[in-house]
Amino acid sequence: TAVLKMSELSPLTASRLGELALEAGIPPGVLNIVHGYGKVAGEPLVRHPDVRAISFTGSTATGQRIVREAGLKKFSMELGGKSPFVIFDDADLDRALDAAVFMIFSNNG
């Protein structure tokens, strides 16, 4: 089974992924969605004895906390990077710029 805990700023995306998994035929309970802030929802997952591996994308500071708390669990991390952003030829450039700035700086880590 897998547990998905996405950013608290994107709860609808996480919920939709869960719905799509069910629609694709993945049995209930195989993909589990958890909503909440990192300290409240993420830390208990990192510490839980039944969690064998952790994949995390976010800030270096949070990654360091996960490494300290994870013990001997396997982990994969993408830390401190910037989000890729595709702007198509027919895009409204003012809206695209606003969206890029929002996504880069509003969901850091």
Question: Could you describe each region identified by the protein language model?
Answer:
Residues 1-29:
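Conserved small-residue-rich beta-alpha loop and adjacent elements
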Residues 58:
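Residues that line or immediately flank small-molecule/substrate-binding pockets and catalytic motifs
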Residues 9-12, 39-40, 61-62:
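Short alpha-helical
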Residues 47-48, 53, 61-109:
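ALDH superfamily catalytic-core signature
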Residues 32-55:
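A structured beta-alpha segment of the ubiquitous adenosine-cofactor-binding alpha/beta core
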Residues 5-7, 35, 88-89:
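Short beta->alpha connector loops at strand-helix junctions that form conserved
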Residues 14-17, 45, 66:
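Hydrophobic packing residues within well-ordered alpha-helices of enzyme cores
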